[in-house]
C-alpha cells in the first residue's frame, strides 16, 4: 500500500531484486537482521531481543538465552508473541536481564522446535550514529585515511551498517553483518563514528567492547528520520509533507522510474568524469571540478519509494532496528534543511522525543553542530550566509533546553569552502 509519504509501514511492498537466502530465519522463527554473530550488546541495562513468528504461531513462547564459551547458561528470559497478526507475522520481544561487559558469548533464541544461534557476541557500549553525509563520510575517504586504516585493527571495536534504503530491503538486510574493526572492513564505516568509538575505547576500560550502529543516508532532511504522526503534529512538519505531496502529485509509476533513471545516469556520468579528473590530477580542487563538470546533480527526484522522502528511512531503517539496546545517539545532520532552517529547532526536538519514545528511555543525544563552511554562491553574493548559523543555534538551543542532550561544536573543524 502507498500512503501520502510512500510505502506504508509494514507493507509487503519491498525493494525488488534477486532473492538471497534469509539469514535470520529458522522455520517459524524470524529475528531482526541487526542480530548477527560478532555483534555488541549493550551492558548494564535490559537487552532487547526481537523479531516475528509466522502467523499461525501467534501467542507462542519465545526463549532467549546467553551462554558462556563453555556452554554454561548466563541469562535466560521468555515472552510470548503478539496475538495480533500484521502482514502474516506476529511480533515478539524478549527482554534479557542486564549484564556487565564481557564475552565472547553465544545468544540463542528458541521458538518451539526452531532455534537460531549467534556466536562471538560481546557486551559493552553501543551507540547509534545517524544523520546525513556529514555522518556518512566513510573512513576510507577521510583525511589521513591510509594511516587510520593501517591503525584501526581492534577486535573489541565493531560496527553494523544499516542498509541504506527508503523501502524495506530484505535482501540487503540478509547480507548485512556486524564487523570487527580492521583495515579490510573499516573503510566503509562512518569516519565520525569510528573516531568516536576509538575515543571510547581509549577513555573507558581497555577491555570494554564498543559497538556502532551506522544509520544514515547522505542528503536526507531531518523529516526523513521522523514518522508521519510526528510530522503531522506541527505546522513545521506538515510543511515538509505538503511539499513532498506536491512534488509527486499526478505522476505515474513510469514517470517516477524515468525521472530516477535519468538522474542516476547524470550522477554516473558526473562521477565518472570526476574520477577521471582525479586520476589525472590527485590534487585537483573541488571548485575546479565544478567548473569543468558542474555541481553533482542534486537534488534527486522524489518518488513514493525514495530514500530522500519524508519518513522513508524512518520506516525502512530506524524502525527495523528499534529497540536494539543502546547507550545513546550520535547525530550529525542539518545542511539539507538550510532553506527551512526556521523549522529546525522544533523538528529536532520532536525527533529526539520520538526516537527516545521508540527506545522507551531518555537516552543521551549528542548533536554535532554544523562546521564552518561557506558555499561558493554565498561567497559570490548569491546566497544567504546566515542559514547555517540559524541551524547551529537550533542545535545549541536543543542542548540547552532538553535534558541529556549535548551539542558538540565543530566551528574550527571545517574548511572555508569544503565541508
Q: Across the structure, where does each feature detected by a protein language model lie?
A:
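Cell-envelope and extracellular/periplasmic
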Residues: 2-419
Amino acid at each position: 500500500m502507498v500512503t501520502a509519504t510512500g510505502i506504508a509501514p509494514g507493507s509487503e511492498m519491498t525493494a525488488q531484486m534477486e532473492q538471497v537466502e534469509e539469514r535470520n530465519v529458522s522455520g517459524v522463527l524470524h529475528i531482526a537482521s541487526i542480530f548477527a554473530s560478532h555483534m555488541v550488546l549493550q551492558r548494564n541495562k535490559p537487552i532487547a531481543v526481537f523479531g516475528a513468528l509466522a502467523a499461525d504461531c501467534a501467542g507462542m513462547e519465545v526463549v532467549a538465552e546467553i551462554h558462556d564459551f563453555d556452554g554454561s547458561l548466563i541469562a535466560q528470559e521468555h515472552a510470548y508473541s503478539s496475538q495480533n497478526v500484521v502482514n502474516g507475522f506476529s511480533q515478539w520481544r524478549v527482554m534479557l536481564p542486564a549484564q556487565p561487559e564481557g564475552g565472547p558469548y553465544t545468544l540463542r533464541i528458541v521458538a518451539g522446535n526452531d532455534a537460531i544461534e549467534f556466536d562471538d557476541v560481546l557486551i559493552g557500549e553501543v551507540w547509534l550514529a545517524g544523520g546525513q553525509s556529514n555522518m556518512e563520510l566513510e573512513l576510507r575517504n577521510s583525511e589521513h585515511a591510509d594511516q587510520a586504516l593501517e591503525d584501526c585493527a581492534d577486535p573489541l571495536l565493531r560496527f553494523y551498517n544499516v542498509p541504506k534504503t527508503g523501502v524495506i530491503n530484505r535482501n540487503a538486510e540478509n547480507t548485512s553483518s556486524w564487523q570487527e574493526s580492521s583495515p579490510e572492513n573499516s573503510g566503509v564505516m562512518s569516519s565520525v563514528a569510528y573516531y568516536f568509538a576509538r575515543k571510547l575505547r581509549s577513555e573507558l576500560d581497555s577491555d570494554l567492547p564498543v559497538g556502532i550502529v551506522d544509520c544514515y543516508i547522505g542528503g536526507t532532511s531531518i523529516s526523513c528520520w521522523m514518522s508521519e504522526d510526528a510530522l503531522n503534529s506541527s505546522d513545521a512538519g506538515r510543511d515538509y509533507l505538503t511539499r513532498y505531496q506536491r512534488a509527486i502529485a499526478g505522476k505515474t509509476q513510469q514517470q517516477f522510474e524515468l525521472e530516477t533513471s535519468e538522474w542516476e545516469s547524470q550522477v554516473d556520468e558526473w562521477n565518472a568524469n570526476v574520477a577521471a579528473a582525479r586520476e589525472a590530477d590527485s590534487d585537483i580542487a573541488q571548485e575546479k571540478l565544478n567548473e569543468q563538470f558542474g555541481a553533482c546533480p542534486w537534488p534527486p527526484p522524489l518518488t513514493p519509494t525514495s530514500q530522500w522522502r519524508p519518513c522513508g528511512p524512518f520506516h525502512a531503517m530506524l524502525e527495523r532496528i528499534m529497540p536494539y539496546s543502546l547507550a545513546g545517539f550520535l547525530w550529525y545532520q542539518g545542511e539539507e534543511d538550510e532553506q527551512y532552517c526556521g523549522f529546525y529547532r522544533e523538528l529536532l526536538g520532536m525527533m529526539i522525543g520520538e526516537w527516545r519514545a521508540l527506545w522507551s528511555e531518555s537516552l543521551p543525544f549528542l548533536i554535532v553542530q554544523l562546521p564552518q563552511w561557506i558555499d561558493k554562491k554565498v561567497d559570490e553574493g548569491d546566497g544567504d550566509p546566515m542559514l547555517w548559523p540559524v541551524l547551529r543555534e537550533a542545535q545549541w538551543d536543543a542542548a540547552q533546553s532538553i535534558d541529556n542532550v549535548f551539542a558538540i561544536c565543530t566551528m574550527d573543524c571545517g574548511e572555508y569552502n569544503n565541508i
